[in-house]
Amino acid sequence: MKQAFNQRISSALNQRKQAGLNRSRRVVSQGNQATLVVDGKSYLNFSGNDYLGLASSKELMEAWQEGLSLYGSGSGASPLVTGYSKPHANLESQLAEWLGLDCAILFNSGFSANQAVLFSLLEKGDTLLQDKLNHASLMEAGMLSPAVMKRFKHNDVDHLKSLLKRSSDEPTLVVTEGVFSMDGDLSPLADIAKLTKENDAWLMVDDAHGCGVLGTNGKGCCDVYSITPDILIVTFGKGFGLSGAAVLCNQECGDYLSQFARHHVYSTAMPPAQAHALSHALLMIQQQEWRRDKLKELNQQFESELMNFLGAEKTPTPIKPIIIGEATDAMILADSLKERGLWTTAIRPPTVPVGSARIRVTLSANHSSADISALTQAINELG
């Protein structure tokens, strides 16, 4: 019987290798900066999610060091035992006030926050409607939940409308991302919010890639479209330059999650020093508009310099997909760019649909205009 696991593991690995879809981890130095180092060689880094450049900010590092001196290294327990401290409470109240919802509940990752909501909220007889391109954390939780999950075509409001009409008699939760991580496009949140309200459904928005980057003072996609969802997910590994996540909702829903969301109840709380640093990151996001202004300038430059490159998608975000098609071709381009000192990542199935393998370029406020030109010139020449 023990051999069955070995055979299963070996077979899965071999299939992925034969399909050219095997992925590997690379040990990097300074991976949170505009330049990273791998095996002693420097590369311009166009693969991270540190959009505002906070991850390497000395100001933010000093805030975390201050938190360490005040609160020590770890929280020591789960939130409902003794792991919930003043920095956690402060961060939650600051997030709720900033984003205009009653309360916030902290989680250790966006993946766990998404799964916690779906696993704790949905019951048998409920309907879950998800955008087809939602994150793996949402899709996995939906498939494993007792609810009936249906997927609507990407950003297709008419398809969602038809699904809502069919599920009008059941409690229904509609889930979409604010910014889609592989395409860099925005969800039509105003239309979706209107539909959910008309059909007495709840709306959940995962704004992992929008919060901090878009909207007034970085409030994210919901601010862009002037909506307030029933549940809002924000994560701290992108615009905030750190890690972790929060679920924002009304007070009663927050009380419910603090009792029944197992990812929250049974996980050690994030270090209080981290929560302290996140409060400072929030202040930087609110006050340092120059970071978003610079991103806009770099975005315009990137799209202008690749305007004639087939497959370069225009987006209103720092996520710039370059659609190649076949996975092997995407890998070849990524490797060729690395030879020129440009670190990009080839995104292949199953992360994206078959036939849509791509180079996923991400921009950061830490990049310079010269960095962008180096990348676009290489892409134009190699493509």
From Swiss-Prot:
Catalytic activity: 6-carboxyhexanoyl-[ACP] + L-alanine + H(+) = (8S)-8-amino-7-oxononanoate + holo-[ACP] + CO2
EC number(s) recorded for this UniProt protein: 2.3.1.47
Alphabetically ordered keywords of this record: Biotin biosynthesis, Pyridoxal phosphate, Transferase
Residues bound to pyridoxal 5'-phosphate: 110-111, 181, 209, 235
GO annotation, biological process: biotin biosynthetic process
Residues where substrate binds: 23, 135, 351
An example molecular function term from Gene Ontology annotations: 8-amino-7-oxononanoate synthase activity
Family: Belongs to the class-II pyridoxal-phosphate-dependent aminotransferase family. BioF subfamily.
Name of the protein in question: 8-amino-7-oxononanoate synthase
Naturally occurring in which organism (per UniProt): Aliivibrio fischeri (strain ATCC 700601 / ES114)
